[in-house]
Protein backbone atom coordinates (compact mmCIF):
# COMPACT_ATOMS: atom_id res chain seq x y z
CA UNK A 1 0.00 0.00 0.00
CA UNK A 2 2.84 2.40 0.87
CA UNK A 3 4.56 1.55 -2.39
CA UNK A 4 1.39 2.34 -4.32
CA UNK A 5 0.99 5.72 -2.58
CA UNK A 6 4.66 6.54 -3.10
CA UNK A 7 4.43 5.66 -6.81
CA UNK A 8 1.32 7.81 -7.25
CA UNK A 9 3.03 10.74 -5.51
CA UNK A 10 6.11 10.41 -7.72
CA UNK A 11 3.94 10.36 -10.85
CA UNK A 12 2.09 13.49 -9.74
CA UNK A 13 5.35 15.35 -9.06
CA UNK A 14 6.81 14.30 -12.42
CA UNK A 15 3.71 15.42 -14.32
CA UNK A 16 3.72 18.81 -12.55
CA UNK A 17 7.40 19.33 -13.40
CA UNK A 18 6.74 18.45 -17.05
CA UNK A 19 3.80 20.87 -17.27
CA UNK A 20 5.86 23.68 -15.76
CA UNK A 21 8.74 23.03 -18.16
CA UNK A 22 6.34 22.99 -21.11
CA UNK A 23 4.83 26.32 -20.03
CA UNK A 24 8.28 27.88 -19.83
CA UNK A 25 9.15 26.66 -23.33
CA UNK A 26 5.93 28.09 -24.71
CA UNK A 27 6.86 31.71 -23.99
CA UNK A 28 7.76 34.10 -26.80
CA UNK A 29 11.34 35.48 -26.64
CA UNK A 30 12.57 39.06 -27.05
CA UNK A 31 11.74 40.80 -30.36
CA UNK A 32 9.54 37.97 -31.65
CA UNK A 33 5.98 38.54 -32.85
CA UNK A 34 3.17 38.17 -30.29
CA UNK A 35 0.22 39.49 -32.34
CA UNK A 36 -1.87 36.31 -31.97
CA UNK A 37 -0.79 35.48 -28.40
CA UNK A 38 -0.18 38.76 -26.52
CA UNK A 39 -0.01 37.11 -23.09
CA UNK A 40 2.77 34.64 -23.96
CA UNK A 41 5.88 36.83 -23.79
CA UNK A 42 8.64 35.41 -21.61
CA UNK A 43 9.24 36.70 -18.11
CA UNK A 44 10.51 40.29 -18.02
CA UNK A 45 8.94 41.09 -21.40
CA UNK A 46 5.67 42.66 -22.50
CA UNK A 47 3.74 42.53 -25.76
CA UNK A 48 3.75 45.99 -27.39
CA UNK A 49 1.54 46.61 -30.42
CA UNK A 50 1.83 49.11 -33.26
CA UNK A 51 -0.52 50.04 -36.10
CA UNK A 52 1.21 49.72 -39.46
CA UNK A 53 0.55 52.27 -42.19
CA UNK A 54 1.47 52.14 -45.87
CA UNK A 55 1.06 55.44 -47.75
CA UNK A 56 -1.28 56.72 -45.03
CA UNK A 57 -3.52 53.63 -45.06
CA UNK A 58 -3.73 51.41 -41.98
CA UNK A 59 -2.53 47.88 -42.82
CA UNK A 60 -3.16 46.19 -39.50
CA UNK A 61 -1.56 45.79 -36.13
CA UNK A 62 1.70 44.05 -35.31
CA UNK A 63 2.88 43.17 -31.82
CA UNK A 64 6.35 42.30 -30.54
CA UNK A 65 7.74 41.10 -27.21
CA UNK A 66 9.95 43.85 -25.80
CA UNK A 67 11.56 44.58 -22.44
CA UNK A 68 9.08 45.87 -19.84
CA UNK A 69 10.84 49.09 -18.87
CA UNK A 70 12.03 50.14 -22.36
CA UNK A 71 10.26 52.80 -24.42
CA UNK A 72 10.84 53.07 -28.15
CA UNK A 73 10.41 56.37 -30.01
CA UNK A 74 10.14 56.98 -33.74
CA UNK A 75 13.16 58.37 -35.56
Curated annotation (Swiss-Prot):
Keywords: Disulfide bond, Secreted, Signal, Toxin. One of its GO terms (molecular function) is toxin activity. It comes from the Eukaryota. The keyword Disulfide bond applies. Expressed by the venom gland. GO terms for cellular component: extracellular region. The keyword Cell inner membrane does not apply. Residues 1-21 form the signal peptide. Disulfide bonds: none annotated. Contains 4 disulfide bonds. InterPro entries: Spider_toxin_CSTX_knottin. It is found in: Secreted. Belongs to the neurotoxin 19 (CSTX) family. 06 (U6-Lctx) subfamily. This is U6-lycotoxin-Ls1f. It comes from Lycosa singoriensis (Wolf spider).
Amino acid sequence: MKLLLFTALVLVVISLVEVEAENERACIPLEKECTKTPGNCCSGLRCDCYRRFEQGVAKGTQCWCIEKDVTYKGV
